[in-house]
Amino acid sequence: MKNMTEGEPLKLIIPFMIPLLIGNVFQQLYNIADIIIVGRTIGVNALAAVGATAPLFMMLVILTLGMSGGFSVVTGQLFGAGDLDGVRRSAAMSTMLCTMFVIIMMAAAVMFIDPVLALMNIPPELYADAKSYVMIIVYGLIFMMAYNMLSNILRSLGDSKTPLYFLIVATLLNIVLALVFIINFGWGVPGSALALVVAQGFSGLLCIIYIAKKFPVLHVRLSDFKWDSRFAWEHIRMGLPMAVQFSVLGLGMIIIQAICNQFGSETIAAFTSAMRIEQLALQPMISFGLAMAVYTAQNFGARKFGRISRGVKKCSQLSLAFSLFAAVIMYFFGQEMIGIFLDNPSPKVMAEAKQYLHLSVPFYFFLSQIFIYRNSVQGMGISMIPMLSGVVELLLRSAAASYLTIDYGYTGECYASPIAWVGSSIFLFASYHYFLRLLARKNLGFKLK
C-alpha cells in the first residue's frame, strides 16, 4: 500500500506512474498481438474484420474499466481517510455492483449485436468473423471485469506494480494461445478472441490469489456483503458517470468506425493499424492521468486540497513534454511501424495509415491535458464533469466525422478525433479551475498558486 498524501507530489506520482505505463503498454501489446497474428497469418480481411469491430470491443473494455475505476475512487478516498473497515466494505460493494453490471452488459450485447453490427456498416465478407469475435469477448466479460476491478482496487491502495506483473503474464499467455488456436488448431478469428478471454481469466485469478495472501485489508467477510443502499449509491455515483463517460467516448469511436467501414477493407486495415500504433504512443499520457486519479482521490479524502493543485500543475507540464515527444515519434517513424501488422501491405494501406498519423499528431498536446484534468476531477469526486466532457467529445467527433467526410472523404475522417480533443480539453481545463477556486473560496486551508 502506498500513501500519496505526504511528500513531494512528482516523487510520488512518477514512481507510481511507471508501473502503470508499463502495464498500459502491455495492455496495448495484449491487443496488438492479436491484430498482428491475425493480419500476418490469416490476411487483410481477417485484420479488417477484427478492426471493423475494434471500437465495439473497446466499448466493452472501457465500460468495465470505467465502472470499476469509478468504484475504486471511493476505495481510494476511504484509504486516504484511514478507514480500513470502509476499504473492505467498498471492495465487497464493488464486487456486487460489478457482477450486476456484467450481467446487464451481456444481456444487452446478446439482444442487440446484430442491429449494432448492421449500423456499423460491416462489409458482408467480414460479417461472420466480426460477429464471432465480438460474441466470444462478450461471453468472457466476467473475466475482463474481474481483472479490471481487482487491479483498480489494488491501484487505489497504492499498489501499481502487482497488476503490471499479472498483465505481463496474461499478455505472454495471450500470444502463445493465439498462435496455438490460430495456427495449430485452425480456429481463425474466433481463436484469437478465445485466447484473449482465457488470458484475461488467468490474470483475474492471479489477482485473487495475491490479494488472499498479501492484502488482509481486502479480506472481505460475509457481513461486508450486506446491502447498504446509501453506500451502494456512493459507488454508483462515481462508477456510473465514469462508465457513461467512457461509453460515450466509445460510441463516438463506433460512429467513426462505421463511417470508415464504408471505404472498404484496405482503408479499414489502414485505420485500424494507425490507431493501434497511436494508442501505444499515447500510453505515457494515459498513465499520468491514471496516476493523478489515485493521487487526487487520496488527497481529497485526506482534505489536502493544496497538494492536489500542486500535483496537477506539475503533472500537466510533464505530460505536455511527453505529448511533444510522442508527436515527433509518430510523425517520423509511425509509417515504419505499420508494416508489423500485415505481410506485404498494399501502398494504399501504408499511405492512408501515414495520412492519419500525420494529421493527428499536432493535436496530442490537447489530448495530454484531457487525461490529466479528466482523471483529476474524477479523483476529487466531481463525477459529472468527466461525463459531460465525454458528451462534448461525442458530439464534436460525430459531427466532424459525418460532415467532413462528405467533402473530404477519408481526410475528413482523420480530423474527427483531433477536433474532439480540442473541445473536450478546453471544457475540462475550465471546469477543473472553476471547482478548485470554489474550494479555495470555502477557506479549506489552501491558496491557489
Model-derived features: positions:
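Small-residue hotspots at the loop-to-helix junctions and early N-terminal turns
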Residues: 44-55, 130, 134, 193, ...
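Short runs within selected transmembrane alpha-helices of multi-pass transporters and secretion channels
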Residues: 68, 137-155, 163-171, 192-207, ...
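Helix-terminus/linker motif at the lipid-water interface of multi-pass membrane proteins
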Residues: 25, 29-48, 117-124, 180-187, ...
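Transmembrane helical elements of multi-pass membrane transporters/channels
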Residues: 15-34, 136, 147, 170, ...
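Small-residue-rich hydrophobic transmembrane alpha-helices
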Residues: 47-107, 144-163, 270-334, 367-389
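Generic alpha-helical transmembrane segments of integral inner-membrane proteins
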Residues: 21, 25, 29, 33, ...
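Short alpha-helical transmembrane segments in multi-pass integral membrane proteins
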Residues: 1-17, 75-140, 184-240, 296-362, ...
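Residue-level signal for short hydrophobic patches within transmembrane helices
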Residues: 6, 10-29, 33, 56-63, ...
